[in-house]
Amino acid sequence: MSAAEGRSRPRLNGSADIKTLRRYFIGGSDARIIMGDDEPALIRLWREKRGEVEPEDLSGNLVVQLGLATEDLNRRWYEASTGQVVTDVQKRVRHPALRWMGATLDGRVEGSDAVFEAKFMLPWSFSEEAAAEKYMPQLQHNMWVVAARTAVLSVITGGGKWVEILAHADPLYQHLIVTAERQNLRSAVTIRC
């Protein structure tokens, strides 16, 4: 671990401002950006981690707000449809060894300890393949953080469709994610010096 990674940082707790704390760790949503191909989003994330810009205000993004508004419904629908119970809702966790890796879990599936991720997608851009591809970095990151072997992606679409997608941990892909995240965080911390 580098000196930059080992530096003392605020702890995640319920009373802390999560927007401020997000600067000090890489989360699942960050993994999706880091492993994606949206260069402006990647540059913005890098600048956020450096403290140059505030996290983007998504309160005016209707699709994001629909996702937030349907998370509880999504979880209840998943539980009713599968008979499974989701625990650890909105639990903030850190990787036990790589303290710069964190996750805010939508939940864990009781009994299997699978990571549960609830998403809302617009019907005209939805396919199971597209959903799995879009959210795979986030699922793999979150599975790595909590040492889970599986994840469940529960998707509600604006067209009234619900889909469950099961993902298995992919150690090779997780290694690539950790490497890319580490490089992103190191560059944000060290270039400032």
Task: Please place each PLM-identified region on the residue numbering.
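Charged, glycine-rich intrinsically disordered N-terminal tails and low-complexity linkers that flank
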Residues: 1-69, 73
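Nucleic-acid nuclease catalytic cores
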Residues: 64, 80-188
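A carbohydrate-recognition surface predominantly in extracellular/luminal proteins
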Residues: 74, 78
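Long, amphipathic alpha-helical segments that form or neighbor coiled-coils/leucine zippers used
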Residues: 192-193
